[in-house]
Each structure stands twice: as C-alpha cells, then as structure tokens.
Amino acid sequence: MDSSIASELDAAAVLPGENFSRVALTPEAKELLLRLRPIHGELMFHQSGGCCDGSSPMCYPKGEFLTSEADVLLGVFDVEGEELEFWMSREQFEYWKHTHLTVDVVTGRGSGFSVEAPEGKRFLIRSRLLG
C-alpha cells in the first residue's frame, strides 16, 4: 500500500446509507489547516461547480459561507478534536458522485476568498474513482 494514502485523514461518512469516506486530507493539508485555525477559528470547506477558482476547494471560517439545500455535506473531519465539514454544491456532486476526493495543498496563488491565500499556498482536489 502507498504510504501517502495510509497517512491521509479520512472524513466520517455522513451521507445516508453510506459507510465509506468520500473525502480525505493529505498530511500537508491537515498541517496547513492546523496553522490556519488559530488565525481564523473553526474552518469549513466548500467545493462549488464553477470554473476557475470555483473548481478548487474553498476554505472559510465556519459559518462564513452559508450552505443550503443546494449543497451536500460529503464528510466531517476530526482535525485534532475539532470538526471540519466538507460541503459540495449538489449540482457538482451529481458529476462527482462516483469519485473519492483528497484535499491536498500546493505552493501557489489561490482565490483571495479562501483563507489559505495569504500563506502562498492553495488547496486543491485530487480525485479517484470510488470502488
């Protein structure tokens, strides 16, 4: 087994009828989240279906991005004792429902709306088919 996969943090399964994780964090993504939390408080992710920055996972202070029935909660991470939700637009989920998502981080400029932007880092999604 690939050691990078073994060290990923899986989100708890939350969709009705499912018992598997749909989303994970790489160790690097978790480390960045732990650095961002003291600055911004509790955090959340939202993945929209837009183009450009809209196709990247956006990290917000929890509650700053308002979710609705147009969004799906894909998973909840336990990041050292604090919950971190990962949401996706329902429309995007229809395209990606057969996909496992891994949140990773790379050096580079992301969206100015996502809290990691001033760090010179950006979150991105790596995906693979479920199953």
What are these regions (language model features)?
Residues 1-131:
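Domain-level signature for proteins that mediate thiol-based redox and metal-cofactor handling
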